[in-house]
Amino acid sequence: MFRIGQGFDVHEFAEGRPLIIGGITIPHEKGLIGHSDADVLLHTIADACLGAIAAGDIGKHFPDTDPAFKDADSAVLLQKVWGFVREQGYELGNLDCTIIAQKPKMAPHIESMRKRISELLETSIDNINVKATTTEKLGFTGREEGIASQAVVLLQKK
């Protein structure tokens, strides 16, 4: 049996925070605002995984009203989600992600992101695709107000 999940997330830029995307710290003058470390890509992947097994979203499992998740490492949150997915008897078929950002350029960091995500999801890097695009200076990402991401995951029963 196969299950497909889709995820989407957006975070706003802010001064004085590190920029963490896909579990990788990226040099940039701004970071993203969030209750956790605001890793927009790992949040998107977690939502896609939870959606594939009809288990809600990360807000349900890790609410931003809970102080326990303040400044949480999104890699740890994704590992918890992935553990739950595996408990339900699923393994990863493949994951396809898109980061939507005007700046910074993501291309130099894509392979590091793929490697980190493959480690978190306990799978071959060949099952992980990460790509990036701009919005040609349109919308909030084009105005460099924040970053968005999308992901689609295919899970298969073990």
Swiss-Prot record:
InterPro entries per the UniProt record, alphabetical: MECDP_synthase (IPR003526), MECDP_synthase_CS (IPR020555), MECDP_synthase_sf (IPR036571)
Catalytic activity: 4-CDP-2-C-methyl-D-erythritol 2-phosphate = 2-C-methyl-D-erythritol 2,4-cyclic diphosphate + CMP
UniProt keyword list: Isoprene biosynthesis, Lyase, Metal-binding
Site feature (Transition state stabilizer) residues: H35, T134
GO biological process: isopentenyl diphosphate biosynthetic process, methylerythritol 4-phosphate pathway; terpenoid biosynthetic process
Cofactor note: Binds 1 divalent metal cation per subunit.
Named cofactor requirement(s): a divalent metal cation
Assembly description: Homotrimer.
Protein name in UniProt: 2-C-methyl-D-erythritol 2,4-cyclodiphosphate synthase
Organism this protein belongs to: Bacillus cereus (strain B4264)
Gene this protein is translated from: ispF
